[in-house]
Amino acid sequence: MARPAACLFDLDGLLLDTEPLHARAWREAAAHFGRQLNAAELMQLRGRRRLDCAEQVRGWIAGAADPESGAARSDPPSVEALLVHAQPMAGAPELVRRCAELAIPMALATSSSRAAVALKAAPHPWLELITVRVHGDDPELREGKPAPDVFLLAAARLGQEPSSCWAFEDSPAGARAAEAAGCRVHVLLPEGGDPEAYPEGVRWLESLRELVL
């Protein structure tokens, strides 16, 4: 199999094991308004921008929360303090280092804000190898996942056609975004994830260690 022209990586749930912490934050925020989020609803929030998630949660709690209120805070202080302890997903550091060794261009295509990425990435110097980044609050980003914008922008900043790039995702929203951008999509299926929620034709991974470059 030919190597990709570039690799475009999601962050949460793909390179770092932060998704359980974000799920906890949204569960607590909704519970504050008397709404219990189930696993399927939490999966719908996975991979999306904070304010996009807040709008969704506000709908679920019948308009009780404003996007800038407590329900919009994806990282309450108690959870934010835990993010710096998030561990790498199995095989993530090795994959990123392998791309660097092979001089395969890399970009981060994440829904997390610049500040949130800085917080999560600080304990993981291997993430510094990914110097091109598109954050959820990037001023050039028009729409968040599942729109393709984040992957289109990441590929453009690397000077590559999206169709020549491999995109790595874990969420249905992210996989749909990467597919819509025209990337070859690799999905690290999360525990409890429903394959039918993802686009057809993705390459499934049980671990990033499976990937050979």
What is each PLM-predicted segment?
Residues 1-5, 97, 113-114, 118-213:
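Asp-based, Mg2+/Mn2+-dependent phosphohydrolase catalytic module
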Residues 1-43:
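Active-site neighborhood of HAD-like aspartate-dependent phosphohydrolases
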Residues 15, 88, 106, 167:
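Conserved SAM-binding loop
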Residues 25, 53-56, 91, 116-119, ...:
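Phosphate- and divalent-cation-binding pockets in alpha/beta enzyme and binding domains
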Residues 27-30, 49-64, 120, 154-155:
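Helix-loop "lid/cap" segments that line or gate small-molecule binding pockets
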Residues 31, 100, 179:
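Anion (oxyanion) recognition and catalysis
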Residues 36, 56-97, 102-104:
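Metal-dependent phosphoesterase signature
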